[in-house]
Protein backbone atom coordinates (compact mmCIF):
# COMPACT_ATOMS: atom_id res chain seq x y z
CA UNK A 1 0.00 0.00 0.00
CA UNK A 2 2.82 2.38 0.89
CA UNK A 3 4.44 1.70 -2.49
CA UNK A 4 1.20 2.52 -4.28
CA UNK A 5 0.89 5.84 -2.44
CA UNK A 6 4.55 6.67 -3.19
CA UNK A 7 4.10 5.79 -6.86
CA UNK A 8 1.01 8.00 -7.17
CA UNK A 9 2.78 10.81 -5.31
CA UNK A 10 5.80 10.50 -7.64
CA UNK A 11 3.59 10.88 -10.71
CA UNK A 12 1.71 13.89 -9.34
CA UNK A 13 4.81 15.76 -8.17
CA UNK A 14 7.85 15.77 -10.44
CA UNK A 15 10.82 14.18 -8.77
CA UNK A 16 13.72 16.15 -7.40
CA UNK A 17 15.74 13.06 -8.32
CA UNK A 18 16.69 14.31 -11.78
CA UNK A 19 19.88 15.65 -13.30
CA UNK A 20 22.84 15.24 -10.96
CA UNK A 21 20.37 14.37 -8.18
CA UNK A 22 18.99 11.29 -9.98
CA UNK A 23 19.13 8.21 -7.78
CA UNK A 24 19.17 4.49 -8.33
CA UNK A 25 18.92 1.41 -6.17
CA UNK A 26 21.60 -1.26 -6.36
CA UNK A 27 21.81 -4.47 -4.37
CA UNK A 28 24.82 -6.74 -4.18
CA UNK A 29 23.25 -10.17 -4.08
CA UNK A 30 24.22 -13.00 -1.71
CA UNK A 31 26.71 -14.49 -4.21
CA UNK A 32 28.46 -11.14 -4.62
CA UNK A 33 28.62 -10.75 -0.84
CA UNK A 34 29.95 -14.27 -0.26
CA UNK A 35 32.54 -13.83 -3.02
CA UNK A 36 33.72 -10.59 -1.38
CA UNK A 37 33.07 -8.39 -4.42
CA UNK A 38 31.69 -5.43 -2.42
CA UNK A 39 34.83 -3.32 -2.56
CA UNK A 40 35.38 -3.87 -6.27
CA UNK A 41 31.76 -3.02 -7.12
CA UNK A 42 31.64 0.07 -4.91
CA UNK A 43 35.02 1.20 -6.29
CA UNK A 44 33.68 1.13 -9.86
CA UNK A 45 30.73 3.39 -9.02
CA UNK A 46 32.88 5.78 -6.97
CA UNK A 47 35.51 6.02 -9.72
CA UNK A 48 32.75 6.79 -12.23
CA UNK A 49 31.88 9.81 -10.09
CA UNK A 50 28.62 8.67 -8.52
CA UNK A 51 27.80 9.51 -4.92
CA UNK A 52 26.85 6.80 -2.41
CA UNK A 53 24.00 8.19 -0.29
CA UNK A 54 22.84 5.05 1.54
CA UNK A 55 24.13 1.55 2.20
CA UNK A 56 23.27 -1.27 4.57
CA UNK A 57 23.84 -4.99 4.88
CA UNK A 58 20.59 -6.86 5.46
CA UNK A 59 19.20 -10.34 5.62
CA UNK A 60 16.16 -9.59 3.47
CA UNK A 61 12.82 -10.99 4.56
CA UNK A 62 10.66 -13.05 2.22
CA UNK A 63 8.00 -10.33 2.43
CA UNK A 64 10.44 -7.61 1.31
CA UNK A 65 11.80 -9.75 -1.52
CA UNK A 66 8.33 -10.62 -2.79
CA UNK A 67 7.46 -6.91 -2.84
CA UNK A 68 10.73 -6.08 -4.55
CA UNK A 69 10.28 -8.69 -7.29
CA UNK A 70 6.48 -8.37 -7.61
CA UNK A 71 6.73 -7.69 -11.36
CA UNK A 72 8.29 -11.15 -11.80
CA UNK A 73 5.74 -13.08 -9.73
CA UNK A 74 4.33 -14.90 -12.78
CA UNK A 75 7.74 -16.05 -14.02
CA UNK A 76 8.73 -19.71 -13.50
CA UNK A 77 11.94 -18.70 -11.66
CA UNK A 78 10.22 -16.33 -9.18
CA UNK A 79 10.20 -18.67 -6.15
CA UNK A 80 13.84 -19.68 -6.73
CA UNK A 81 14.83 -16.02 -7.04
CA UNK A 82 13.12 -15.06 -3.76
CA UNK A 83 14.69 -18.06 -1.99
CA UNK A 84 18.15 -17.28 -3.38
CA UNK A 85 17.95 -13.59 -2.44
CA UNK A 86 17.00 -14.60 1.10
CA UNK A 87 19.82 -17.15 1.36
CA UNK A 88 22.44 -14.69 2.60
CA UNK A 89 23.30 -11.06 3.20
CA UNK A 90 22.33 -8.43 0.64
CA UNK A 91 24.09 -5.06 0.43
CA UNK A 92 21.41 -2.49 -0.39
CA UNK A 93 22.69 0.82 -1.76
CA UNK A 94 21.44 4.11 -3.15
CA UNK A 95 23.68 5.93 -5.62
CA UNK A 96 23.22 9.46 -6.96
CA UNK A 97 24.45 11.21 -10.10
CA UNK A 98 23.68 12.34 -13.63
CA UNK A 99 21.87 9.57 -15.56
CA UNK A 100 22.82 7.13 -12.79
CA UNK A 101 19.95 4.70 -13.55
CA UNK A 102 20.94 4.21 -17.18
CA UNK A 103 24.68 4.33 -16.56
CA UNK A 104 24.52 1.86 -13.67
CA UNK A 105 22.68 -0.62 -15.90
CA UNK A 106 25.42 -0.27 -18.52
CA UNK A 107 28.11 -0.77 -15.88
CA UNK A 108 26.31 -3.84 -14.50
CA UNK A 109 25.81 -5.57 -17.86
CA UNK A 110 23.06 -7.84 -19.15
CA UNK A 111 20.94 -9.96 -16.81
CA UNK A 112 22.45 -13.04 -18.43
CA UNK A 113 26.21 -12.83 -17.84
CA UNK A 114 26.83 -14.76 -21.08
CA UNK A 115 25.56 -11.68 -22.94
CA UNK A 116 27.56 -9.18 -20.85
CA UNK A 117 30.63 -7.49 -22.25
CA UNK A 118 34.02 -7.67 -20.54
CA UNK A 119 34.46 -4.58 -18.39
CA UNK A 120 30.93 -4.80 -17.00
CA UNK A 121 30.39 -6.19 -13.51
CA UNK A 122 28.55 -9.26 -14.78
CA UNK A 123 30.92 -9.65 -17.73
CA UNK A 124 33.89 -9.72 -15.36
CA UNK A 125 32.51 -11.65 -12.38
CA UNK A 126 29.58 -13.86 -13.44
CA UNK A 127 28.94 -17.04 -15.38
CA UNK A 128 25.40 -18.13 -14.47
CA UNK A 129 22.21 -16.07 -14.86
CA UNK A 130 20.96 -17.39 -11.51
CA UNK A 131 24.05 -16.02 -9.74
CA UNK A 132 24.58 -12.65 -11.37
CA UNK A 133 26.02 -10.75 -8.38
CA UNK A 134 24.06 -7.48 -8.51
CA UNK A 135 20.63 -5.95 -9.01
CA UNK A 136 20.14 -2.47 -10.47
CA UNK A 137 16.93 -0.50 -10.98
CA UNK A 138 15.82 -0.50 -14.61
CA UNK A 139 14.07 2.90 -14.60
CA UNK A 140 13.68 6.03 -12.48
CA UNK A 141 10.25 4.81 -11.41
CA UNK A 142 11.65 1.43 -10.33
CA UNK A 143 14.47 3.19 -8.50
CA UNK A 144 12.06 5.34 -6.50
CA UNK A 145 9.89 2.32 -5.66
CA UNK A 146 12.85 0.13 -4.68
CA UNK A 147 14.53 2.84 -2.61
CA UNK A 148 11.25 3.35 -0.70
CA UNK A 149 11.03 -0.42 -0.10
CA UNK A 150 14.56 -0.87 1.23
CA UNK A 151 15.24 2.45 2.99
CA UNK A 152 13.52 4.88 5.32
CA UNK A 153 13.88 8.54 4.22
CA UNK A 154 16.16 9.32 7.19
CA UNK A 155 18.60 6.61 6.07
CA UNK A 156 19.51 8.61 2.95
CA UNK A 157 22.47 10.89 3.61
CA UNK A 158 22.53 14.25 1.86
CA UNK A 159 26.10 15.47 1.48
CA UNK A 160 28.07 17.82 -0.73
CA UNK A 161 30.70 16.02 -2.78
CA UNK A 162 33.87 18.13 -2.89
CA UNK A 163 34.77 16.54 -6.25
CA UNK A 164 31.44 17.52 -7.85
CA UNK A 165 32.90 20.51 -9.70
CA UNK A 166 35.55 18.19 -11.17
CA UNK A 167 32.92 15.71 -12.38
CA UNK A 168 30.12 17.97 -13.68
CA UNK A 169 30.39 21.05 -15.87
Curated annotation (Swiss-Prot):
Disruption phenotype: Morpholino knockdown of the protein in the embryo causes pronephric malformations. The active site is at 135 (pros-phosphohistidine intermediate). One of its GO terms (molecular function) is nucleoside diphosphate kinase activity. SMART domains: NDK (SM00562). It is found in: Mitochondrion outer membrane; Cytoplasm; Cytoplasm, Cytoskeleton, Cilium basal body. Pfam families: NDK. Gene3D superfamilies: Nucleoside diphosphate kinase-like domain (3.30.70.141). Catalyzes the phosphorylation of ribonucleosides and deoxyribonucleoside diphosphates, other than ATP, into the corresponding triphosphates with ATP as the major phosphate donor. The ATP gamma phosphate is transferred to the nucleoside diphosphate beta phosphate via a ping-pong mechanism, using a phosphorylated active-site intermediate. Through the catalyzed exchange of gamma-phosphate between di- and triphosphonucleosides participates in regulation of intracellular nucleotide homeostasis. Required for ciliary function during renal development. Homohexamer. The N-terminal hydrophobic region (1-17) is critical for mitochondrial outer membrane targeting and phosphatidic acid binding. This is Nucleoside diphosphate kinase 3-B. The lineage of its organism: Eukaryota, Metazoa, Chordata, Craniata, Vertebrata. The gene is nme3.L.
Amino acid sequence: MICLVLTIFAHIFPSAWTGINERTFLAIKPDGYQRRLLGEIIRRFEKKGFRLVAMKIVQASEKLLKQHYIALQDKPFYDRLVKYMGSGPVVAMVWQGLDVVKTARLMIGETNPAHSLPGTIRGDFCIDVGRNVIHGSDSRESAEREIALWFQPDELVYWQDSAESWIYE
